[in-house]
Amino acid sequence: MPILPKYESFWAFLLIACLIPVLAISVSNLVAPSTSKNPEKSTTYESGIEPMGESWIQFQIRYYMFALVFVIFDVETVFLYPWAMSFDDLGIIAFAEVLVFVIILIIGLIYAWRKGALEWS
């Protein structure tokens, strides 16, 4: 008799989820051609032109801030869509909860706006 019969499928899926990446990387290492130590192959490719300067440049933080604000509001849409589809069944309590959620996001948007995260100069 198994110790935890309810979790047999969970453990099977967990084992499969761990084995698939290991197998994929192993097969890739076996099938991939060997890499040579040629310095020409390890240079940065810039449309056939010799690279100028370093390949690592520092990006400004505003790109990341802009992307972060976008992701936050994109995820908000993902959360609001199921609520909107079942609005009739949920009632006034769910409406109040979503209203609080949207107010918190609006406060965050105002904060980001005042900090200058949305300015592009």
Curated annotation (Swiss-Prot):
<keyword id="KW-0150">Chloroplast</keyword>
<keyword id="KW-0874">Quinone</keyword>
<dbReference type="Pfam" id="PF00507">
    <property type="entry name" value="Oxidored_q4"/>
</dbReference>
<dbReference type="InterPro" id="IPR038430">
    <property type="entry name" value="NDAH_ubi_oxred_su3_sf"/>
</dbReference>
<keyword id="KW-0934">Plastid</keyword>
<dbReference type="GO" id="GO:0008137">
    <property type="term" value="F:NADH dehydrogenase (ubiquinone) activity"/>
</dbReference>
<keyword id="KW-1133">Transmembrane helix</keyword>
<dbReference type="GO" id="GO:0019684">
    <property type="term" value="P:photosynthesis, light reaction"/>
</dbReference>
<feature type="transmembrane region" description="Helical">
    <location>
        <begin position="65"/>
        <end position="85"/>
    </location>
</feature>
<comment type="similarity">
    <text>Belongs to the complex I subunit 3 family.</text>
</comment>
<protein>
    <recommendedName>
        <fullName>NAD(P)H-quinone oxidoreductase subunit 3, chloroplastic</fullName>
        <ecNumber>7.1.1.-</ecNumber>
    </recommendedName>
</protein>
<keyword id="KW-0520">NAD</keyword>
<feature type="transmembrane region" description="Helical">
    <location>
        <begin position="90"/>
        <end position="110"/>
    </location>
</feature>
<dbReference type="GO" id="GO:0009535">
    <property type="term" value="C:chloroplast thylakoid membrane"/>
</dbReference>
<keyword id="KW-0472">Membrane</keyword>
<dbReference type="InterPro" id="IPR023043">
    <property type="entry name" value="NAD(P)H_OxRDtase_bac/plastid"/>
</dbReference>
<feature type="transmembrane region" description="Helical">
    <location>
        <begin position="10"/>
        <end position="30"/>
    </location>
</feature>
<dbReference type="GO" id="GO:0048038">
    <property type="term" value="F:quinone binding"/>
</dbReference>
<keyword id="KW-0813">Transport</keyword>
<keyword id="KW-0793">Thylakoid</keyword>
<dbReference type="InterPro" id="IPR000440">
    <property type="entry name" value="NADH_UbQ/plastoQ_OxRdtase_su3"/>
</dbReference>
<comment type="function">
    <text>NDH shuttles electrons from NAD(P)H:plastoquinone, via FMN and iron-sulfur (Fe-S) centers, to quinones in the photosynthetic chain and possibly in a chloroplast respiratory chain. The immediate electron acceptor for the enzyme in this species is believed to be plastoquinone. Couples the redox reaction to proton translocation, and thus conserves the redox energy in a proton gradient.</text>
</comment>
<keyword id="KW-0521">NADP</keyword>
<comment type="subunit">
    <text>NDH is composed of at least 16 different subunits, 5 of which are encoded in the nucleus.</text>
</comment>
<dbReference type="GO" id="GO:0030964">
    <property type="term" value="C:NADH dehydrogenase complex"/>
</dbReference>
<keyword id="KW-1278">Translocase</keyword>
<keyword id="KW-0812">Transmembrane</keyword>
<keyword id="KW-0618">Plastoquinone</keyword>
